Structure formats: structure tokens, C-alpha cells
Regions:
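N-terminal ligand-binding/catalytic initiation module
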Residues: 1-118
Length: 118
């Protein structure tokens, strides 16, 4: 299994390649040859009364290609600016994020890559 970090991702694929892959996956889904599960978030109170922990996952795959699950780990809090309230998130400290994608072959179940997403 390959371990691919953020620097590797930006070096290995272009935005155009990502867009083409997404278009292909959506076409597979439209044709009934792909599956997906919407993102599911699980929230747990933290010891701080003004923030909570959120774990989120989403997954999908295409026939004859790949299956992927994306996982993320966030601390959530609300910030008021004027009359607006926004939901902010971070992992470990503000400005940092933590997510990863596990990629598998749907032909033999082989784990192919662990991709940093954060």
C-alpha cells in the first residue's frame, strides 16, 4: 500500500485530472455502475462547553475500478462576527485539518493507498 501525503498529491495529479475523474465517477453513478454513501458525521461533546468533536466519513466506488472511504476528524466551535454566526473547525489547533482517504481495488480487495487529506 502506498502512503501519499499532501505534497505528493499536488505533485502527482492536476486539477484537470481530478475533475475528469470526478466526471467519470458521476457518469458511472448515473449509469448504475457506481455506489456512494453520503457523508455521515458523528458528534461527541468535548470537555470544553463551547466546542465538540466531529468524526465524519463518506465512501463510494465504481465497478471494475476503486472503492474509497474518506475520514475526517474535527473540533467544531461557533464564532460570532457582527450579527453572523459561523461554524469553524480545526484539528489539533486552529488552521490545521486532519483527513485521509483509504483506496482499495474492487477487483481483489487490495488496499492500494492511504492518502492524506488535510
Amino acid at each position: 500500500m502506498k502512503v501519499i501525503n499532501n505534497a505528493d498529491v499536488s505533485r502527482l495529479v492536476t486539477q484537470e485530472e481530478v475533475t475528469r475523474a470526478l466526471e467519470s465517477a458521476y457518469q458511472d453513478f448515473f449509469n448504475g455502475t457506481a455506489v456512494c454513501r453520503p457523508r455521515v458525521d458523528v458528534e461527541i461533546p468535548s470537555s470544553s462547553p463551547d466546542q465538540f468533536y466531529r468524526w465524519g466519513t463518506m465512501e463510494g466506488g465504481s465497478v471494475g475500478k476503486y472503492f474509497a472511504i474518506r475520514c475526517k476528524s474535527d473540533m467544531i466551535y461557533h464564532k460570532t462576527v457582527g450579527s453572523s454566526v459561523t461554524q469553524e473547525k480545526y484539528c489539533v489547533e486552529p488552521g490545521t485539518f486532519c483527513g485521509f482517504i483509504l483506496l482499495f481495488s474492487v477487483e481483489n480487495g487490495e488496499p492500494l493507498a492511504l492518502i492524506n487529506d488535510g
